[in-house]
């Protein structure tokens, strides 16, 4: 499409959170601290699930992939957001905006499917424990992880290619802290009904379909747990699933508020706050949730840290 009598937009201005310099400095320090905790926590999970022999199971293999996804997911937005908070020119090029949007959709969709794979793993462990090691073999787990990562390719390519092909001929100020679909779409100078219908269909397929798989898995899990005669067994089963349920609730709860709410109910400020929840806060909380609620992870962290300290002291 061609912009008649107008120059096509070549860069966007990310308005971010505020124009107050003092507030920007405070936000920079706050988000830098969160990002540091996010990286340390998720890399710690990746490390202990890689080196600790007690964590060489399908559940921790998927947790390792989730932590890697969280690192990649935050890497797409947070560094640029931090730079913008201390920079007078909050500019992102047209290509840079498309690239950021592509990887945001890619890692977001991949996480949706990975969470559903983790739910299936818990379903097999609780509902079919005698055949768990046979069903959840190394080959299947590897393909499930690869499939989860690659599931983000179709939606990210489709959404980004279609969005970037639309004409941007007028204003270029994006009222957000990164190039998310809805705020960028507001700058398009033609009717976007077809794109919005396609975006909704993609959302239902790549977000709600994995969520439905999670619901089915946990429905079967809950039924199985309630049929257990042992109170200890029920408590252990619920404890095994609780961390994953909290993560799913945080991720899907906040993401659905952004992409499934009617436009008329969304102010730019509320959208930014909700977006912060699943792009910045949730990735920080995931390793904390899995670490604090899981004795095996806490034990592995202690063993790993102790071993590293002893190696530094030349004990080994």
UniProtKB/Swiss-Prot annotation:
**Where exactly are the transmembrane stretches of this chain?**
26-46, 55-75, 100-120, 140-160, 198-217, 238-258, 272-292
Q: Which membrane topology term applies here?
A: Multi-pass membrane protein
Q: Which InterPro entries match?
A: GPCR_Rhodpsn, GPCR_Rhodpsn_7TM, Olfact_rcpt
The protein's matches in CDD domains, at most eight in alphabetical order, are given as: 7tmA_OR10A-like
Q: Does the keyword Transmembrane helix apply?
A: yes
**For this UniProt entry, what's an example GO CC term?**
plasma membrane
- What is an annotated GO biological process for this record, any one? detection of chemical stimulus involved in sensory perception of smell
Instruction: Please indicate the ranges of residues that lie on the Extracellular side.
Output: 1-25, 76-99, 161-197, 259-271
Annotated glycosylation sites: 5
Task: Give the Cytoplasmic compartment stretches of this protein.
Answer: 47-54, 121-139, 218-237, 293-316
- The organism's superkingdom is given as Eukaryota
Q: Name the UniProt key words of this record, in alphabetical order.
A: Cell membrane, G-protein coupled receptor, Glycoprotein, Membrane, Olfaction, Receptor, Sensory transduction, Transducer, Transmembrane, Transmembrane helix
> Sorted alphabetically, which Pfam families does this protein's record hold?
7tm_4 (PF13853)
Main localization of the protein described in the UniProt heading: membrane
The UniProt family comment states:
Belongs to the G-protein coupled receptor 1 family.
**Listed name of the protein:** Olfactory receptor 10A7
């Amino acid at each position: 499409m061609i912009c008649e009598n107008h120059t096509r937009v070549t860069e966007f201005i990310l308005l971010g959170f505020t124009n107050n310099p003092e507030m920007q400095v405070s936000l920079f320090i706050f988000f830098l601290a969160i990002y540091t905790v996010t990286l340390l926590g998720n890399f710690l999970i990746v490390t202990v699930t890689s080196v600790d022999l007690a964590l060489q199971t399908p559940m921790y293999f998927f947790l390792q992939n989730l932590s890697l996804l969280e690192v990649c997911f935050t890497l797409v937005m947070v560094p640029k957001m931090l730079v913008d908070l201390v920079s007078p020119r909050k500019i992102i090029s047209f290509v840079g905006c498309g690239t950021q949007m592509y990887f945001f959709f890619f890692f977001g969709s991949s996480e949706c499917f990975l969470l559903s794979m983790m739910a299936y793993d818990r379903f097999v462990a609780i509902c079919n424990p005698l055949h768990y090691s046979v069903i959840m073999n190394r080959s299947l787990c590897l393909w499930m992880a690869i499939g989860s990562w690659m599931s983000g390719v179709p939606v990210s390519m489709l959404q980004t290619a279609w969005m970037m092909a639309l004409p941007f001929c007028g204003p270029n100020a994006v009222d957000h802290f990164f190039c998310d679909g809805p705020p960028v779409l507001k700058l398009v100078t033609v009717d976007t009904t077809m794109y919005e219908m396609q975006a909704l269909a993609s959302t239902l397929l790549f977000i709600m379909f994995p969520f439905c798989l999670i619901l089915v898995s946990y429905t079967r899990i809950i039924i199985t747990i309630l049929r257990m005669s042992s109170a200890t067994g029920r408590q252990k089963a619920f404890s095994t699933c609780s961390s994953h349920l909290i993560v799913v609730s945080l991720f899907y709860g906040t993401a659905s508020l952004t992409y499934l709410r009617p436009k008329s109910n969304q102010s730019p400020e509320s959208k930014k706050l909700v977006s912060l929840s699943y792009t910045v806060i949730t990735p920080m909380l995931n390793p904390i949730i899995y670490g604090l609620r899981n004795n095996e992870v806490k034990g592995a962290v202690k063993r790993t840290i102790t071993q590293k300290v002893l190696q530094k002291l030349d004990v080994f």
